[in-house]
Amino acid sequence: FDIIADPNLKPKSIHVSCFDSAPLSVDFEFILKDNIDLFKIGLDALEILCPDNLNLGLKKSQKFLINELSDYNFTVFDGPHPSGNVGVQIHHINPINSGDVVWIIKPEDIITIGSFLKTGEFCPNRTIAVSGPPVNNPMYFKTRVGAKLNSILNHINFNDNCLLYTSDAAD
């Protein structure tokens, strides 16, 4: 994991976890609802790279995504963390053997691919959750990859001076 995909190696499969089961994480269904068309464009491009082996992991409660993505290969998961972990999902869907090449990609990266294919512009946008006990006003922020944390954190009302900032879902 966390290895850049080698474009010269054909993957056995591509996996996308469309939910994060970690506490205080972003709700991907919330993000995908506003970007479902771009997400589908990105999925269609990935299916060209790995026909019949693009696997989406969906959560049982994601009724919108289950309905919208019915034309794609998905597996529904239910249960506590780490059910949203893509490695756990790969283990259940299509286990990795020695020498296998699989790719994993996050939903927002697929939106970025779809947006690029539709507009020709690279827009690496992200929606992040600012949450947890020290946050008086938990909320989502739309930002870009590489944005300075201060541009976001200056808008948050914290109730504690002892804070831990994590990037992604701290997995």
Q: What are the residue ranges of the model-derived segments?
A:
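N-terminal low-complexity segments that are often proline-rich with Ser/Thr-Pro
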Residues: A170-D171
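Buried, small/hydrophobic-residue-enriched core segments of structured protein domains
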Residues: F1-S167
